[in-house]
Amino acid sequence: MPNGGSDCCGTCWFNSENNGEQGYQGSEKKGVAICTIRNLEIPNPFWTYCANHPHKNQNKIDLPLGPVYINDGYPYSRKVWVNPPDNEEIRIKLLELLDKISNQPEFKYPSETVLIEEIIKQLTALKEKRAIDGLKRIINFDIEDYRNQMNFIIRNKSIIVGQAIESLLEITNGEFIDEVEKFINYGIEDNSTVNYYQENDNFAAIRYHLVRGLKHCENPKAKELLMTALKDPHNEVKAFANEILNNKNEC
C-alpha cells in the first residue's frame, strides 16, 4: 500500500493495470504496470509518483507533465527518477497551463508533487522564454489575503509567486531583477523580529525563491539584495543568502 502517499502510480488512471480508472483495482494483478502516457515500466507503482495523477490532474491531461518521482526514504521524501520528455506539444501544453494558474483559493492535496509547481519547474528547466509573460503575470498576483492564512487545506499562493520569481530570474539570467527586488523584504516590512515566528510567515517562500533566483544574476544589485537577505529572520532564507553570496564572492 502507498505509505508515501496515495497520489502514486498504483492508483493512477494512466497505470495500465487500472484500465483507465483511478483506484486500487489493479493492485492484485500480476502483470507489469506500465505508465500509458510515458510508455514507462513502473517496478514499484505504490512508491512512484508524478503530476499527472488524478489527485492533481482532474482534467485527465494525457501529456507527461514534470518528472517521475520515487520514494527517497523516511520521512517520505521524493526524488526524481525519470526526467520528463520534451517536445513542442508538451511545451505548448505547459504554456497553456501556466496561463490558467490563478490567484483563486483552492484546496490542496497534501503531496510534495503539485501540478502547478511542476508546470513552473518544467518550463524553468527548459529555459522556455515564451513563459516570461505568464510568469510576470503570476508575480503580480495580489496575495495579501494569504498573509495571515492558517487554513492548511487551502493552498498558499505565495509559494507560486515565489517560484515564478525564481523561474523568471533563472530563465532570463537576471534580466528582470529590477522588477522583483521589491520582494526582498516582503512579509517582514516592519523589520521587527520581536514577535516573529517562522511557522506563521506565509510570505517566507517569496523571499526564499527570490534569494535562490539571485544566483543566476550577474547584476551587482544581486549582491546588495543578498546582503539584505542575510538579515532575514527566517533561517532558510538567511542560510541560502549566505551560501549564494559566498559563491559569488569566490568567483
Q: Where would I find each of the regions flagged by the language model?
A:
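Cysteine-centered metal-binding/redox modules
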Residues: 1-84, 92-95
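Residues that form or flank phosphate/diphosphate-binding pockets in enzymes
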Residues: 45, 175, 221
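Low-complexity, intrinsically disordered Gly/Pro/Thr-rich segments
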Residues: 34-38, 223-231
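Short coil/turn segments at helix-helix junctions and helix-capping linkers
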Residues: 232-236
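Structural detector for internal amphipathic alpha-helices that build alpha-solenoid repeat scaffolds
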Residues: 68-88, 96, 106-128, 137, ...
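Amphipathic alpha-helical segments within extended alpha-helical solenoids and repeat-rich scaffolds
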Residues: 94-100, 138-147, 180-193
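Core helices of alpha-solenoid repeat scaffolds
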Residues: 87-91, 132, 177-181, 222-223
